[in-house]
Curated annotation (Swiss-Prot):
Cell surface protein involved in the ability to sense and respond to changes in the host environment. Required for stress response and confers partial antifungal drug resistance. Contributes to the DNA damage response. Required for the flocculation response stimulated by 3-aminotriazole-induced amino acid starvation. It comes from Candida albicans (strain SC5314 / ATCC MYA-2876). It is found in: Secreted, Cell wall. One of its GO terms (biological process) is filamentous growth of a population of unicellular organisms in response to starvation. Disruption phenotype: leads to reduced flocculation stimulated by 3-aminotriazole-induced amino acid starvation. Residues 32-53, 78-119, 158-201 have a biased composition (Low complexity). This is Stress protein DDR48. Sequence repeats lie at residues 20-27, 32-39, 47-54, 58-65, 66-73, 77-84, 85-92, 93-100, 104-111, 112-119, 123-130, 131-138, 139-146, 147-154, 158-165, 166-173, 174-181, 185-192, 193-200, 205-212. Residues 1-20 have a biased composition (Basic and acidic residues). GO terms for cellular component: cell surface; extracellular region; hyphal cell wall. Induction: Expression is induced during filamentation, biofilm formation, after UV exposure, as well as by benomyl, caspofungin, and ketoconazole. Also enriched in azole-resistant strains and in stationary phase. Expression is repressed by SKO1, HOG1, RFX2, farnesol, and in alkaline conditions. Expression is also controlled by the filamentous growth regulators CPH1, CPH2, and EFG1. Residues 1-212 are annotated as: Disordered.
């Protein structure tokens, strides 16, 4: 009898989809690296520190759909921009106050806040699946709908210090330091979250990283 054993082992191949590397990522479902996403931008799920066209996840300073200073996003946010709320202004909120239904403002949010979030997807420091520090999908600290830091390519949203619904320190529904909230929060506290903590469902993040 003749036994033939044949193996082909390729130890130098990496065909991964879910992993990241420090500084770049061409991912589908997972997260981003500290400095960049898929070539500085991605149309999937990842984010990078400087720009992203993402859908789901977030990284330090950027969010699922946003990046620091500019974003053409749909859902999520990044450091300095958010899909729903921002530092000092929000779709329905402003600095320290909100008449929110779903989202929040600086330090608190029904969905997210600076350092805390009640997120569903994933979050990062200063950004959330719905909000981020300094800008929002409807508002931003200087820009909104698809905001960038200080400028925006908005549709019905806001710009620096003012918003379609809100403005810095005041809002279409709220004003500085006060709110007519329903189930959400105010400065430093949240219906779901508080400053530095979160009541998340899906994944959570930590300073500069996310739990995807």
């Amino acid at each position: 009898m003749v036994f033939g054993f044949g193996k082909d082992d390729d130890k130098d191949k990496n065909d991964r989809r879910d992993n990241d590397s420090y500084g770049s990522s061409n991912r589908r479902n997972n997260d981003d690296s500290y400095g960049s996403s898929s070539f500085g931008s991605s149309n999937d799920d990842d984010n990078s520190y400087g720009s992203s066209n993402k859908r789901s996840n977030d990284s330090y300073g950027s969010s699922n759909t946003d990046s620091y200073g500019s974003s053409n996003r749909r859902d999520n946010d990044s450091y300095g921009s958010s899909n729903n709320d921002s530092y000092g202004s929000s779709k329905t909120d402003s600095y320290g106050s909100s008449n929110r239904s779903g989202n929040d403002s600086y330090g608190s949010s029904n969905n997210d806040s600076y350092g805390s979030s009640n997120r569903k997807g994933n979050d990062s420091y200063g950004s959330s699946n719905t909000d981020s520090y300094g800008s929002s999908n409807t508002d931003s600290y200087g820009s909104s709908n698809t905001d960038s830091y200080g400028s925006s390519n908005k549709r019905g949203n806001d710009s620096y210090g003012s918003s379609n619904d809100d403005s810095y320190g005041s809002s279409n529904d709220d004003s500085y330091g006060s709110s007519n909230r329903r189930g959400n929060d105010s400065y430093g506290s949240s219906n779901d979250d508080s400053y530095g903590s979160s009541n998340r469902r899906g994944n959570s993040d930590s300073y500069g990283s996310s739990d995807y």
